[in-house]
Amino acid sequence: MVKLTSIAAGVAAIAAGASATTTLAQSDERVNLVELGVYVSDIRAHLAQYYMFQAAHPTETYPVEVAEAVFNYGDFTTMLTGISPDQVTRMITGVPWYSTRLKPAISKALSKDGIYTIAN
């Protein structure tokens, strides 16, 4: 006879192994925070490239929160709340390496977090 506790333990193990998924609008703040996290990490990894882009496009500005997050190596996600979805999209898609570097990294990060997006 199987004990009820061993069945419960088995169900808990299966549930822990299955990743939960969530479908969110592309403008949802949780999606924006994942996108901004990837963006900040990319800026840190390719800072010279972003400086050159900024020099060539001085009208392309960044919110002060993004600049602070780039140079604050602690938990920066709380700094990035409140940036509008339109501004997030403009910043991320406005660089020439969006399609080749940022978009795949964002897709991977969203998938890792079990987040799938739908168009607004």
Swiss-Prot record:
InterPro entries tied to this protein: SRP1_TIP1, Yeast_SRP1/TIP1_CWP
Membrane topology label: Single-pass membrane protein
Subcellular localization, as worded in the UniProt entry: Membrane
Cellular component, GO annotation: fungal-type cell wall; fungal-type vacuole; membrane
Matches recorded under PROSITE patterns: SRP1_TIP1
Example GO molecular function: structural constituent of cell wall
Coarse class of the protein's main subcellular location: membrane
GO BP terms, alphabetized: fungal-type cell wall organization
Record-stated family: Belongs to the SRP1/TIP1 family. Seripauperin subfamily.
Protein name, as recorded: Seripauperin-20
Organism: Saccharomyces cerevisiae (strain ATCC 204508 / S288c)
Originating gene: PAU20
